[in-house]
Amino acid sequence: MIQFVAFGGALLWGKLAKWMGAKQSVILSLVVWSGVVIYAYFGLYGETRVTQFFILGIFIALVMGGSQAISRSLFAQMIPKGKEAEYYSFYEISERGTSWIGPLVFGLANQMFGSLRPALLSLIFFFVIGLILLPFVKVDKAIADVKAYDANRA
């Protein structure tokens, strides 16, 4: 189920990116991710817990497929032609080099509070950091600089 919904999410976020721009779509995805975490924290109670879990899974899949695709697409626009391997290598190294931070924060929150719910809520920290930093990224300037760099090399 998740893979099929994620595929649809990628298509949906692609349309959103065309309509509102890739950077704004990534920002929106961070807001939706925060909402998903808040829903996971507050929403999974009672007799309808299984249904709520499936609803949560659908939202996770929708935003996951799209946010990853749009983020990589946005990053690709800021790479000079012929430098893709270098830039994506750096992207992967930085991703792998920091991938332990989320589980560490999650585990520490779980250990401190003795519950997975506060640990889930701790994940919002990363989305908020993205929401704070992303507006400072000058995407239009980066894309223009790449075009100028490529034109000078031709």
Which residue ranges define each predicted feature?
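A membrane-interface helix-boundary motif in multi-pass transporters
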Residues: 108-127
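Multi-pass alpha-helical transporter architecture, strongest
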Residues: 121-153
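Residue-level signature of mid-helix packing/kink "hotspots" within the transmembrane helices
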Residues: 3-11, 99-100, 104
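Loop-to-transmembrane helix entry/capping segments in MFS-fold secondary transporters
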Residues: 81-90
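Intracellular juxtamembrane helix-capping segments at the cytosolic ends
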Residues: 66-79
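Hydrophobic core of transmembrane alpha-helices in multi-pass small-molecule transporters
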Residues: 49-66
